[in-house]
Each structure stands twice: as C-alpha cells, then as structure tokens.
Amino acid sequence: MITLKELYRIGYGPSSSHTMAPRKAATLFLERNPKAVRFEVTLYGSLAATGKGHMTDKAILDVLDELRTTIIWKPKTFLPYHPNGMKFQGFDAEGHITENWTVFSIGGGALGEEGKQNLTFEEIYPMNSATAILAWCMHTGKSYWEYVEECEGKDIWDYLAEVWNT
C-alpha cells in the first residue's frame, strides 16, 4: 500500500489532477533539464479542455518561468494511456531539444508514464489487505494505529495533524 502522505496531500490547488500533478511534472522536468533555456509544454485532452479554469498553465509557468515557456493547448487530442496527458520539451541555447517527456496526471496529484510504474506513489506497507493487517494485529497484539506508525514512522502523526489543521 502507498503512504498516507500520498492519500492526504497538501498542495497547490484548486485541483490535484489539473494543478498539483502538472506542477509536480514541471518541477521534475526542470530538475532533469537545469540547463534548458526554453520550454514547451503541450497539454492534451482533459488537461487542455479545462486547464485554464483549473489554472494548469499557472501551475506550470510558476515552475518553468513564464518568459521562457510556451504552453500549447490540444483539448481535442487524447493520448492513448490517459486523458490527462502532458508533453514537456526542453531546448538548449541552439534550439536543440534537450529532452522530450510525455507524462500523465493519473489522479490525486499523482504522475504516471505509459508502460512504467507510477512515478509518485511510495509503497511502504508490506500488507495490502485489511485481512492481512488484522491478522498481523492479532498475532502481535498491537493495534491498527501501531501498524501505521511502524510502516510510516512516528512523524506520520505530525503530518496528519498538519493536514487536519490545513
């Protein structure tokens, strides 16, 4: 199972799929292409169709810099893997492509690539069913919250308190 930090996220709104994930993708792309002088981001399908209202462009431009980034909107083009597709391209000073990366906002602020494992989920729970977890609790004499703390670490409670307060 994934960490509770993935399920309960504090992030850039108003939409986890249309702002949090595109912003995260832009951040990852910038980290991979720090020497790029210009960027081009193509938004496809649902991201392009409703992106202005969800501020998808603002989420991306806040990371990549409005002055050196072009956003291309293709609301009628749906990529085969998922309706929330994005293509990032970086360019060097001579205009050559430094990287071409297609990534998808697959829900809840998470990113995915066709044919690859999810890019953002962290699998930290060794047991994947309530039956297995309850059996562990019975066997160890511990409570469910102790299982959570064992897998997540003691800092999970501070994180969940921050989510609650937000």
Placement of each model-derived feature along the sequence:
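Short, hydrophobic/aliphatic alpha-helical segments
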Residues: M1-I10, E40-V41
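Conserved phosphate/anionic-ligand binding catalytic regions in large, soluble enzymes, centered on
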Residues: Y8-A26
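Hydrophobic alpha-helical scaffolding
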Residues: Y12-S16, S46, T50, G153, ...
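Electropositive phosphate-/nucleotide-binding environments in soluble metabolic enzymes
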Residues: T19-R23, H54, K154-W157, A161
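Buried hydrophobic packing segments
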Residues: P22-F29, I60, L64
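Phosphate-handling active-site elements
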Residues: F29-E40
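A structural-propensity feature for long, helix-poor, extended segments
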Residues: R38-K74, P83
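C-terminal regulatory domains involved in ligand/effector binding and gene-expression control
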Residues: T69-T166
